[in-house]
Every structure is written in structure tokens, then in C-alpha cells.
Amino acid sequence: MAYERKEISIEAIRRQEDICREIYDSFVSQKNRPLAMVDTYGCQQNEADSEKLRGYLAEMGYGFTHDEFEADVIVVNTCAVREHAEMRVLGNVGQLNHSKKQRPGQIIAVCGCMVQQEHMVEKIKKSYPVVDLVFGPHELWRFPELLLKTMTSHKRVFAAEKSDGYVAEGMPLKRDSSVKAWLSIMYGCNNFCTYCVVPYVRGRERSRRPEDIVA
């Protein structure tokens, strides 16, 4: 069956930006700027995704830190290509209970390929109560909405639905370097090679339009 390319509308992205402003406004009365930490595992695509996560967080008014004991929000962007990477992530996520004990209001989010797998979501639900928010790569574009829901509901939020994937343009970016950037031209894969998890967690192959790549 042929895959139908699906694109997130620019209006939907704008709604996420409105939520960013809503979160930003909620921090105005605070004396100190809130801080976020984005911890990235895996491939260059994850690096590119983390630039989008940081872009959204910057729009919300967050500064950035590499110290989990300073962070108000921690986002762990995970990899699923090798079992060792998954075990490393889970070990490090488990250690975050120390920072959360020191900062009870700290929000810990786990996203990326690892949590696109149903068994990993169930494992986090049962064994990692320190985690407040879980979302797969197909839900990255609505990170502000999911974070706000976590903040306001005071309940754990899980959003890792099965999907062939989307193309979402127009998300804000915050890059670590002023001289280089991760530039995605396509997402997913159609090959379904033996032992490869990529099509199952990243979805079907879909390309960005040339005009969006060079914009």
C-alpha cells in the first residue's frame, strides 16, 4: 500500500507557538529565569530534533544548563538503534531521581526513538516514576502542548502513538554552533531491513520540499 505524505499545517505550528508565549508569560513574575537541559543520544537526526526542542524551550523563556540539579525541565532525547544505547538511557534516567528529590517541581521528559516502542513506554510507566512526560518523534512538533499539559495537570503524560510519520515545517530552532547546523532533507525509511528498527520508530520515508530545505 502506498504511503500518503502527511504534513502538519502551519496553523498547527502557530498554535504551538501561542502555547510557548502562554508559558513564557507565566514566568514573567518569577525572579529567576527557568532553566532547561536537553540531553541527546544517538544519530544526527536526534541532534537536529534537539535543536527544535531547544528552539521551543527558548520561545517559552527557558535558559539552558548542563547541570541536572539546576534544571527546571530535563528532556532526554533517546536512541533505539542499539540495545546498549537504550540501557545507557534508562540508567541515566534512573539517576535523575536525585535531582528531582532536590527540585520536587522538576519536570523530566523522555522522547525520541526509544519511546516509540510500546514495550519501552510500558517499562517507563511501571519502573521509572521519575519521568513525567513521554513522547515519540512523531509528536515532537507539539512539544509545547504536551509540556503545558504536564505542568497544569500535575499528571504523567504519554504520547507515543503509532504513525507512519509527518513532515512539520516552521518549528523554531536553537543551535549550539554559529558555524554549522544539522539539516534534515528526509525522514524515515521504507526498506524494513532485517533487525533494523528505524522504519518502526521513525516511520515511512518522506522528503522535505526543496524550497523548505533551502529556506
Model-identified regions with their sequence ranges:
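Proteins enriched for Cys/Gly/acidic motifs involved in redox and nucleic-acid/cofactor modification
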Residues: 1-215
